Each structure stands twice: as structure tokens, then as C-alpha cells.
Amino acid sequence: MSNVIRMPEKSLGEIRKEYIFRNRSVQITAEDGERELYPCIVLYEAVTDIPIHYTRLERYLCHLAKNQLLDGKTLEARAYAVCHFLNYILWETDIRSLHECTMDTIRNFLKSSRRKRDEEEYNKDTWLRYRDYLTDFLVLYHKYNQDTLPFRYTGDELRNAIVLRDEQSHRNIAMVYPASLHLKAPRTTHKKNRILVDGYLDLLLYESKKYEPDITLGIALGAYAGLREGEVVNISFGAIRTIRRGFGIISGLEIDLTDDAPFFKGWTGRIDPGSIKKYRRQRVYPDFIHAVSDLFDEHTASMAARNYPTGKDDPVFVNRQGSPMTVKTYTERVKALFYKRFLPALHSTCEQQGTFAEHAAFIDAYEAEYPGAHMFRHWFTMYLLTKAGLTSGEIMRWRGDSSQESMNDYIHENADMIRLFRETSYTFQEQILVAIGKEVP
């Protein structure tokens, strides 16, 4: 770093504080010819905002193989975390290059980064995520430069590994996760009440079919295939493939998420339309194939009846003006459905069934805080954990996680939610809703 900045009339400490590392998004042409934003870690003169040095450190943000699976926002977040660390080195130490960092340097940075500038602690999940981003970066930087640079830390010091025995496959599974460095994360964890109790989904889908039929298929894809909200709106009609076996019997449904939707390429709108977090081919879980297939047929017929195009490159989900639905519109409509239709119906049916006391805590929690459209993907995970009896590796595949660690972290962090899902249930009875229909606004 000091090799880049040479101004002898000032002390080195003063000089270093006049510069800052920032992420600069640059447009590159991808293999498919599309223009995409890619992070670039650049050293700037702070006052003038003039780029001084293009570091090329963005090469170490993630593995090349993983790079194809990460969207621009994730890469941007990784670059931000690395810039935060580089600025700490630049302003708070006299280290001249990354390989001079010691484990104490890294630990001191993580310790100092627990609090924001206003002294408020970072959210625990945010801090852990950025710690992992930094760890990945430092491990990769060491891996690809250890033969040419005299490092004062090693990649192994930043990682812990344990070997577990999978009782079903009878194979050993290696779990690798960031070292704690004897640092506790901030105590500010605030978990959203994202649990959708077993049976609630049936009621929500019922209400959606009546009042929001245009997003019902999207809800089902989140709950029955684990799609994220941004992935739902990225689906074209050609991306949903029906798999058939003998006599035309449907044996599977596969959603092609290997590329961004054609109708979002070259997007010029003011807001982000939604993105695919992990590019993949995602199958609907076997227990729900026929339910999703029926909803897809109904959705397609409804679109065609209103003269919306249903060609292979056309959007499955459109807004009320007939344009491709953005993730913002989709999530807003899910939220409106949740509060205007689902929650009143849940309240009324529980009273009629005499089960309100059992569900009052969930209803109160929903009224206090919206669980978010991501609740459908959580429901999918809960189902796989409690009803399907799959191993964590199998659940990881169905969820579309990029690593085993992500799945294991999810199980550990949501242990209470998993227990509640196992122990609580709601029986959806359509006839009760019909009988009290006038009471549900």
C-alpha cells in the first residue's frame, strides 16, 4: 500500500489517511454477450475521488467456480467487506501489504468492526456474514500467493474443520467453517418470526387463489421448490419443464434458473427487477409435483384468456399493466395478501375451531412483525427437515444452497423454529371459511 502512495513532504500516517479503498462497479461483457456489473476494488484519493490504483484484489472475492453462482449484489457485498478491512489496514496500521497481516491484525479488525460509527452494534447475522466474506478472501489470497509472498498468516489458521459420519450414506463428511478467533459476535440478533406453521400455507394458498390468483403459483414455487422471491419473478414460460415417464404420466417439474430471464436482460427500470442468487436447475419436491403442475396449467390458461403472451421467453408473472413483475411488486402483493386476507381468515377460523389459544402467539407475532415473503422458502426447509426426513446434504441440494456450511448454519440458528414447526399444526377446513365468509373482509 505504501508503495503506491509516495509523498515525502508528509508523514506516512498522514498520507495514508488521505486515501480510501472503495468498490467500483464496472461493466463487463459476459460470455453470453450481456453487459454485467462486476466489483472492482480501487484505491481512491478521498477528497477528490480520483482513482489512484486498481488493485485487482477482486480476483480473490470468491472461487472462480463459485463466481458463476453469485449475483452482482452478493459480489458487491463481498467487495464492501474486503474494502472495510483494507481501509482498517491503511488507516490504523503501518502494514504495507496484505501478506504482512498477522492473525492479531485480522482479529483486531473483527473486534473493532463489531460497532458502527455511531457506536451501535452491528446485527449479529450481518457481522457473521461479513466475517465469512473476509475469511474467504484472505484464504484465497493466501492460497494463490503463498509460493511468492512471505505470509505472516495461513489459510488453515482462518478455518476449522471437523469430520462427521453420515449414518445413512456411511460416508465421512468434512465440515469447514471460519475460525472464531475467540471473538463473540454482537448480541443483537433479531430473528424475524418467519415460521409458517404446518397448515397455515394451505389457508394462505386458498386465500391467494381467491384474491391474488396471479401470484399463487409464485407462492407455491417458494414453498414447494424453495425458490427465492427474486428467482420467482425471473421465470419465463420456457423455463418450466414438465418431465414425463411412460403413458405421459408427470414425474417431475424442473425450473431452469441457469440464467437471468430474457425479459430482464438490458433492464433500464429505476429499481432492481429481481435476481437469481444461485444459478441452477431447481426441481419441485416430489410430494408437490401435481399441485404445482395444476397451478401452472391454471396460471397459463388465465394468462392466455387475458391475451398475455405465453411464449417460451415471456414472463410467467406480470403486473397489472401486463409488464414483467418485479420482485418489489411481487413482495408487496404477498404482504397485502398476508395482512388483508390470510391473517383475518386465520383469526376467524381459529376462533370457530376453538383453537385460538394455541395460535394466538403466532397471530400476535405476525401482527407485530411481518415475516416476509421469504417465509415460503423457510416453510419448504421446515418440511424437508421434519416431514421428508432428509439428510442435511440432501436438504442443501433441494434448497439450492451453495455450501454444506450454509445448510448446517441454518439448522443450528433455527433450532427453535424447527421445534415449533414439529410441535404446532393447524387444520385448514374450507367449510369453516365458507360458513363465516361474511365475517372475513
Where in this protein do the model-derived segments appear?
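Major-groove DNA-contacting interfaces characterized by cationic-aromatic clusters
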Residues: K278-L337, L343-T355
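Basic, Lys/Arg- and aromatic-enriched nucleic-acid-binding interface segment
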Residues: D198-E229
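Catalytic-site neighborhood detector that most strongly recognizes the C-terminal catalytic loop/helix
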Residues: R399-T424
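Short, basic (Lys/Arg/His-rich) helix/loop patches that form interaction surfaces
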Residues: T331-E394
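Conserved tyrosine-mediated DNA breakage-rejoining catalytic core shared by Y-recombinases
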Residues: I235-L295, A305-K312
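N-terminal core-binding DNA-recognition domain of tyrosine recombinases/integrases
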Residues: L57-Q168
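Short, charged phosphate-coordinating catalytic segments
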Residues: Y144-L149, A220-G252, G393
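C-terminal secondary-structure termini that scaffold catalytic or DNA-interacting sites
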Residues: S425-P441
